[in-house]
């Protein structure tokens, strides 16, 4: 399968989307707000509800929109990487407190987002036979579940503990559904955005 990389203009657009996404996420979800939303308001078990219902879907919108605004591959990777790096830089430079359970802004956080972005790129590439909206939804669902599994197996055991097996099916189902919805939302956002930016 031949892989065509994005051009310089598309790379800059993806980088800007990643930076804007990081700024929005940083100020929309200050310390403790995600845990409060998913556990106290929605009453969901954890750990992982915040990843599957908030962080993952937000990243999916950033990554998939960037991918759709690019003719070649690499948009999702650049946008996701910029999201993670800029988020980490702002948190460390301005000493902004974050929830240590999710290690937001740490090297583990950046590594998890990089894996997420690689999975997103692969899902978008492998789903080319599907219609565009289903391709985006497939990407969102797969990437969101992968991000959640990374947190369950690598990050949460270090910070808060292992997920209970009885809670895993519910969270995976919600994670998958939110990934599908986020992919669809990203597809919808990209259509007017691509016309406004005159990229395609």
Where is each model-derived feature located?
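Membrane-helix interfacial "entry" motifs
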Residues: 2-13, 48, 52, 68, ...
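Hydrophobic alpha-helical transmembrane segments
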Residues: 14-19, 57, 61, 74-81, ...
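Alpha-helical transmembrane segments of multipass membrane proteins
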Residues: 20, 24-28, 62-63, 83, ...
